[in-house]
Amino acid sequence: MKVVISGYGKMGHMIEAVLQRRGIELVMASEDVCSVPDDIAKECVCIDFTTPEAFRANYPTIAAKFKAVVVGTTGWYDIKDQVFAAFDRHNTTLIWASNFSIGVNAFFAAIQRVCEVLKEGDYTPSVKEIHHIHKLDAPSGTAKSIADLIEKGLGRAPEIESKRIGEVPGTHTAEFVSGVDKLVFTHEAFSRQGFAEGAVVAALLTEKVTGIQEFKDIIL
């Protein structure tokens, strides 16, 4: 497998290190992925960790150029239908996620199961998330994913509280409160390393799956 990294910030450098450790060829890391030559792109998986604005501008070209694409960028889900249509049109495999951490995806599975158990009870749900001050979207894509799971499971949408503090990699908490008890579930990331590891796992999965896939639906 050959990889092009779209976005060469902190996450891009972490992904580069994971690829190197796994012996996966990194063809290039670029802040201008649209300029990658077509003959190179068609042989590569693109791993995109940019900004919402950059992905919104670049996705038509990314979908047309690359063999497969892994998208860890969030903040574009309001145009999900247009994005998916572009990848469908070019028959390009897309794996996307609000969070590629394996631990977070286990957290998703736990919340889904908890909601199945609590749905007959009188519980008020809420979601809290804390991220570093550089995080552009609020609530985070992960917080929205947790809220969606809760709404589907309990039939009521939780309130989401978002905070941006220092260099916090990401902490997400789901609470369920009734008149008799409270359940609290928390995932705390110690670094962004887990996101990079999961993104590379997703890139490897593009050799086994096709179409448009959400990461959690593949691994859970």
Descriptions of predicted regions:
Residues K2-S6, K10-D38, T51, E120-L220:
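C-terminal substrate-binding/catalytic lobe of Rossmann-fold NAD(P)-dependent oxidoreductases
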Residues L26, V69-V70, T93-L94:
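Hydrophobic beta-strand scaffold residues
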Residues V27, C44-V45:
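Conserved acidic residues
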Residues D39-I40, P52-T73, K80-F84:
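Rossmann-fold NAD(P) dinucleotide-binding segment
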Residues C46-I47, V70:
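N-terminal Rossmann-like NAD(P) cofactor-binding module of classical short-chain dehydrogenase/reductase
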Residues T73-W96, N105-V114:
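Rossmann-fold NAD(P)-binding glycine/threonine-rich loop
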Residues T74-W76, N99-F100, I130-H132:
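Short, ordered loop/turn segments at secondary-structure junctions
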